[in-house]
Amino acid sequence: VSFTKMFSGCTNLTNLDISNFNTSNVVYMSYMFSGCNKLTSLNLSHFDTTKTNNFEFMFQHCNNLESLNISNFKLKNNIRCLFYYCNLLKELNLSGVTATNITNLQWTFANCKNLKSLDLNDWDVQNVTTMHQTFSSCTALETLNISNWKTSDKLTTMYATFYECSSLKQLNLSNLDTTG
C-alpha cells in the first residue's frame, strides 16, 4: 500500500483527523504531508510503520508545524528530507522511535530552526551513505545526542552536516568513520 503524496500540497489544511487510519500494510509514506503549510500539530503515534520502507520528504515544508508526534515509528532505509523546512517545529516526540538500516540522512532535519534538543543516540546509521546537510541551519539546536552513532566506510559525504548549528554547545563524533 502506498500513501505517497496523500495530502501533499494541501496548503490550506489546518486540521486533520486520521486517528482511524490502519497503516499496518503501508510501504511508502514519502511526501505524505509535504507542503501542508497550515497544519500546526499532528499526532501520528498510532501509525504502524513496521512495513514502511520510505519516509523521504514526509513532512517537508510543513512550515507552520509546531508539534509533531511520531512516537513508536519504525524508521528505516530512506529518511531523506523527513523534516526538511519544518521551520517552526518545536516539539518533536521521538519516544519509542527505532531507526534501523538508515541509508540516507540528507537534509533530514535541515532548517528546523526552532528545535532545541534531539536525542538520536540509538539510531542505527551503519549503512548511511550521506549525511549531506543533515542538521544544517538548525540554529536553535543546543543539544544533539548522536554519541553512539557508528558509521562505516559507506559514508561518503558529510557536506555541511552541521552548517549554521550556531547554538550547539558540544558534540561527540568519536564513533563516526570518516574514511569513506
Question: Language-model segments: what does each one mean?
Answer:
Residues V1-G180:
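Negatively charged
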